[in-house]
């Protein structure tokens, strides 16, 4: 029998535009196969029986989401997002007062694997702080001279990880940390950085490197390849 972790909900911030994709359509609404990237991302969350509800934070005035079949799903709630990612996540958290633990997942990350998600959810039994999916850095890392493209030095990649999503935290702790970080003008690039700012140390849960975020045009074809491969493996 699969493990169950009660009181788990999810927030998907989907109010961004993604100008690096060089399209007029926000990247989360680009299609892979017969579904949008957003639909793939949310479907991966709902495939786990522990996830009771998903709140999607969209841009005010968004007319695309309501046209998706996802908009009618009984476990989906939509709210207006904010100017920044942290604002959208907070808006989603406010719509989930019943949640004990909350996953936050990128709208443009469609290739989440269920085994990774299950191992992340297991943190609710062993941690009071939570953690994130992450992948160890494998490439040689270079730091550039400030404002230039010349190499300043090589960065030791030992103990360096790529932060992925979902990220998974107790709801009240995440609300408190995001609120404090925003009020104090801290730079928050993901949810874990808000906890770090407040003195907490979330866990790193090793995840698959093919859990990519679609950011640039070439990422779309790569995500399609990974999703197609995953479907073939499930049928095998």
From Swiss-Prot:
Pathway in which this enzyme or protein is active: Isoprenoid biosynthesis; isopentenyl diphosphate biosynthesis via DXP pathway; isopentenyl diphosphate from 1-deoxy-D-xylulose 5-phosphate: step 2/6
Enzymatic class: transferase
GO molecular function: 2-C-methyl-D-erythritol 4-phosphate cytidylyltransferase activity
Any one GO BP annotation for this protein: isopentenyl diphosphate biosynthetic process, methylerythritol 4-phosphate pathway
Site for Positions MEP for the nucleophilic attack, residues: 157, 213
EC number: 2.7.7.60
Domain of life from the UniProt record: Bacteria
Functional description taken from the UniProt entry: Catalyzes the formation of 4-diphosphocytidyl-2-C-methyl-D-erythritol from CTP and 2-C-methyl-D-erythritol 4-phosphate (MEP).
Subunit description: Homodimer.
This protein's name: 2-C-methyl-D-erythritol 4-phosphate cytidylyltransferase
Gene: ispD
